Amino acid sequence: MKNYNFNQWCKTAWLKFSLMITGCMLVLMLINWNTWSTPLKCIAVVAALIPVHATEEWIFPGGFAFQYNLFLNKSEYPACYPMNRASDMVTVLGTTIMYAIITIYFAITGKSVPGGILLGATCFSALEVSVHTFFGIKAYFTFKDRGKTTIYGTGSMTAYTGFLVLGIIMIRQMIAIGLSGKDILFCILVLGITSIL
């Protein structure tokens, strides 16, 4: 049997594992479609969408870390610093697991998903759309002389078709349920955990 090391885990194994979480979230959501609330479905979709989004960023077509390192950090080593597969693995896998645990908790307890969790997920979605729009525009202006004709940047497709649509649905849900000061504090906690990851 071949030795399995951290480098191999960071290449694609972590992404395959996170896509298994995507599959589990989608199956759970479909099985419980008639009993789960819309906010709970939204959180499950966030957990399911993050690995799909990371797959677009890293594999199909890939290259997001290069954009991030070049445009945001002006790195001398854009292929590997400061974002690389290991650092993104921690972020993506950690955030995916966090939202999966939140989903499972509220599914098991039957409690309503607080507005603060929806607000945190909405802010996360807005951040994804904003970052990918910025990188897409920056890439267009940087590389238009070399043939770039669109503002598409790696990750933009799932950012727009997934996180943008999901963010709009979650905003509608927050308007329907209302937000309290406690929800805003809870949102700050969720975003704080996400930013640490």
Language-model-derived ranges and their functions:
Residues 98-161:
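Membrane-proximal helix-loop-helix units in multi-pass membrane proteins
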Residues 26-40:
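Short, hydrophobic transmembrane alpha-helix segments
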Residues 68-91:
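Juxtamembrane helix-capping/reentrant segments at transmembrane boundaries
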Residues 162-197:
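Terminal transmembrane helical module of multi-pass membrane proteins
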Residues 1-8:
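Short, Lys/Arg-rich, polar N-terminal cytosolic tail immediately upstream
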Residues 18-25, 87-106, 158-171:
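Core segments of transmembrane alpha-helices
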Residues 51-59, 122-137, 192-197:
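Transmembrane alpha-helical segments that form the membrane-embedded catalytic/substrate-channel core
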Residues 10-30:
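The first (N-terminal) embedded transmembrane alpha-helix
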